[in-house]
Swiss-Prot record:
Can form homodimers, however it is likely to function as a monomer. Interacts with NFKB1. Interacts (via N-terminus) with JUN and FOS; these interactions inhibit the binding of active AP1 to its target DNA. Interacts with MYOD1. Interacts with HDAC1; this interaction affects HDAC1 activity on MYOG promoter and thus inhibits MYOD1 transcriptional activity. The keyword Transcription regulation does not apply. The modification Phosphoserine is found at S102. One of its GO terms (cellular component) is nucleus. Its main location: cytoplasm. The modification Phosphothreonine is found at T125. This is TSC22 domain family protein 3. Residues 76-97 are annotated as: Leucine-zipper. It is found in: Cytoplasm; Nucleus. Residues 1-60 are annotated as: AP1-binding. The lineage of its organism: Eukaryota, Metazoa, Chordata, Craniata, Vertebrata.
Amino acid sequence: MNTEMYQTPMEVAVYQLHNFSISFFSSLLGGDVVSVKLDNSASGASVVALDNKIEQAMDLVKNHLMYAVREEVEVLKEQIRELVEKNSQLERENTLLKTLASPEQLEKFQSRLSPEEPAPEAPETPEAPGGSAV
């Protein structure tokens, strides 16, 4: 494959797709493409027809790829929404735990942290009054 003249990966991909196997397009779009390939004395109309079939196949591939990308984007957006909600819930829980923890509990928690770890804003699991975990 001669791709030296193509500068971007997209140009290379388009070149590769354009030069993809005629038999693949034939199976995808109909058997008449194979006859054009086998006919070495193809007329200009046959070449145009072949180019049109290739363009249709490329459009089909592009549409399928766009559909797959849109689906993946929707899945990722939903995951982001779920993570944002979980983050908000954890922030609310953290705020509640900060307000319920006594200064002694905060000091005890911070003393258990290793020296290389920065101290968090609040304990992760402080004990509630009475000695039980919240």
